[in-house]
Amino acid sequence: MSYQPNKVLEVFDNPKIERDFIIQINMPEFTCLCPKTGQPDFATLHFAYIADKACIELKSLKMYIWLYRNEGAFHEAVTNQILDDLVQVSNPRFIRLKAIFNIRGGVYTTIITEHKQKNWTPKAKVDL
C-alpha cells in the first residue's frame, strides 16, 4: 500500500472529553527545504496537547508532515504553520510544538510555539 503526502489532517472524537490528559507525539524525521539554498533541513518535532472534542489522527499527521519534504520554508514559519493547521482542525484546549532543527552552518535552531483556548485553565499539576 502506497501513501502519498496529504494536506488533509483528520481527527477522531476524544474518548475522555471530561478529562484533561496530555497527548505527546514525537516525530524525529521532519524534513523541509531551506528557502535560501534549497538544501534539506531536518528536525525532530515534539507535540504535546490536551484535546477538547477531537484528537489528531496519527497517520494523517504523518502524511501531512511528509508534505513539507519538498517545500521551502524558514524554521519559524513552518513550525507556526504546522501549529496553526493543527489548531484549525482540532481546536485543542492547549497545544505546544517544539521543533528542534539539526545543526546547519554551526547553528542549532529550536522553535517553540503554543496555543491555548481563551477560557481554558489547566488543572493544578500533581507531582508524585
Swiss-Prot record:
Catalytic activity of the protein: 7-aminomethyl-7-carbaguanine + 2 NADP(+) = 7-cyano-7-deazaguanine + 2 NADPH + 3 H(+)
Keyword vocabulary terms for this entry: Cytoplasm, NADP, Oxidoreductase, Queuosine biosynthesis
Species per Swiss-Prot/TrEMBL record: Ruthia magnifica subsp. Calyptogena magnifica
Protein name: NADPH-dependent 7-cyano-7-deazaguanine reductase
InterPro entries noted in UniProt: GTP-CH-I_C/QueF, NADPH_dep_7-cyano-7-deazaG_red, QueF, QueF_type1
Subcellular location, record wording: Cytoplasm
Record gene name: queF
BP-aspect Gene Ontology terms: queuosine biosynthetic process; tRNA modification
Pfam family, one: QueF
